[in-house]
């Protein structure tokens, strides 16, 4: 097996020490760690840009003690969930929502309080309920882990962070919707030949810990191996990348799948999402995807398209019924994956607010309806940003629990039916 050496090292790992608390506030949207201007993190065509409440008892709620043993040597664990084919699973999904700029925020100085580092409030059951009650049945929870992990070779996850992630997952999982957990702003898996082995070791360690903690959850929980794996800070960061980067991402997808499967139990048949380079919707990136050998895979794609309307802050505020890019994307996804029995989830999409709700409504109706025709569920990127100079993809006002754009919300829900 590809991971025989990597997983042997992982099996011996425990959990690390909490980081020192501090203060760090960064404003705005789909930020990538290390950028000087967080609000302008995504500029490529089509790609990215205190908890309370009653909840059902969840599997795996073992607290810190369980996390500390989450990387113990793998042993046989009973499978307790239905074996659902990925195409059948995705057919049950309608429309989704991202808890953006929250657990995916990055800081190396404030520990678990990083959830609020980018200006968003602490996630609550009420927030998740507000979304689900509108008709969303997929909740994607982006999580950044690098600042909550120890050093090699153990890469221990901070127990309090794992506990908090599980708490937020349970807010949605307890409502019976589909939940996607990923690893988000991680610069350590830079996809180069030079970094490939180190990235594989850390990726396997991290996913062994995550998968072990959530092993008893049923088919409603989906793992997404990486967010937008790419060569950050280089001339080939976005869109197609380069051949080396695309090949290494394919390799790391295989590492992710093998690490999860090795934890046993429900994870042997859990449906997993894998991206291509940068999760790009470009032709070259999609055509370069080589899927791992596995029967429970879903392709992950991000598509803020057409770019000049949806993602480019300096672009158009009118849609003008420009369906070409959307149509081409769906046709390509069908050719490469859907027609071959491999489902696709558009894990991030959206059109930023340019004081143009009517235009966004028309665009959303077409985009989601077209995706629905092909059986592709779409997950709106919501960073809780509504005005200012940044990327304003807010849908739910999380402080007031209101929806400032009711017609856009209606268009998303109705078009997914």
Listing of model-derived features with the role each one plays in the protein:
Residues 16-18:
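Bacterial signal peptide processing site
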Residues 119-138, 154-184, 191-225, 248-263:
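An active-site-proximal structural segment forming one wall of the substrate-binding cleft
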Residues 23-75:
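Ser/Thr/Gly/Pro-rich low-complexity, disordered linker/stalk segments of secreted
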Residues 60-138:
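N-terminal carbohydrate-binding accessory modules
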Residues 327-404:
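Substrate-binding cleft of secreted/luminal carbohydrate-active enzymes
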Residues 201-316, 331-352, 373-374:
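Active-site region of glycoside hydrolase catalytic domains
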Residues 11-14:
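C-terminal motif of bacterial Sec signal peptides marking the signal peptidase cleavage site
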Residues 99-123, 151-157, 195, 308-326, ...:
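Acidic/histidine-rich helix-loop elements
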């Amino acid at each position: 097996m590809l991971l025989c050496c990597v997983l042997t090292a992982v099996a011996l790992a425990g959990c690390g020490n909490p980081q020192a608390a501090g203060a760090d506030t960064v404003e705005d949207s789909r930020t990538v760690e290390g950028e000087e201007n967080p609000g302008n993190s995504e500029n490529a065509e089509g790609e990215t840009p205190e908890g309370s409440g009653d909840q059902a008892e969840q599997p795996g709620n073992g607290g810190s003690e369980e996390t500390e043993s989450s990387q113990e040597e793998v042993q046989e664990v009973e499978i307790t969930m239905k074996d659902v084919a990925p195409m059948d699973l995705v057919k049950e999904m309608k429309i989704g929502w991202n808890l953006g700029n929250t657990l995916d925020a990055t800081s190396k100085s404030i520990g678990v309080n990083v959830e609020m580092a980018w200006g968003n409030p602490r996630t609550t059951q009420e927030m998740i309920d507000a979304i689900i009650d509108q008709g969303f049945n997929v909740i994607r929870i982006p999580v950044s882990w690098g600042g909550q992990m120890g050093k090699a070779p153990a890469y221990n996850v901070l127990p309090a962070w794992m506990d908090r992630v599980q708490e937020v997952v349970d807010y949605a999982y307890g409502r019976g919707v589909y939940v996607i957990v990923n690893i988000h702003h991680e610069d350590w898996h830079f996809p180069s030949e030079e970094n490939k082995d180190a990235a594989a070791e850390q990726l396997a360690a991290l996913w062994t810990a995550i998968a072990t903690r959530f092993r008893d959850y049923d088919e409603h929980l989906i793992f997404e191996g990486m967010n937008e794996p790419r060569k950050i800070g280089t001339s080939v960061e976005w869109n197609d990348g380069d051949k080396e980067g695309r090949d290494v991402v394919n390799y790391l997808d295989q590492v992710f799948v093998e690490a999860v499967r090795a934890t046993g139990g429900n994870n042997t048949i859990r449906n997993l999402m894998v991206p291509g380079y940068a999760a790009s919707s470009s032709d070259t990136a999609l055509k370069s995807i080589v899927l791992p050998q596995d029967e429970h895979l879903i392709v992950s794609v991000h598509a803020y398209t057409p770019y000049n309307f949806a993602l480019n802050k300096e672009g158009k505020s009118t849609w003008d019924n420009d369906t070409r890019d959307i149509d081409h994307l769906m046709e390509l996804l069908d050719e490469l994956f859907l027609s071959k029995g491999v489902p696709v989830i558009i894990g991030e999409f959206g059109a930023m607010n340019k004081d143009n709700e009517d235009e966004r409504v028309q665009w959303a109706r077409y985009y989601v309806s077209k995706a629905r025709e092909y059986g592709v569920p779409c997950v709106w990127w919501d960073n809780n940003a509504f005005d200012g100079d940044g990327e304003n993809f807010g849908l739910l006002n999380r402080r007031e629990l209101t929806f400032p754009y009711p017609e856009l919300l209606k268009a998303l829900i109705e078009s997914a039916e």
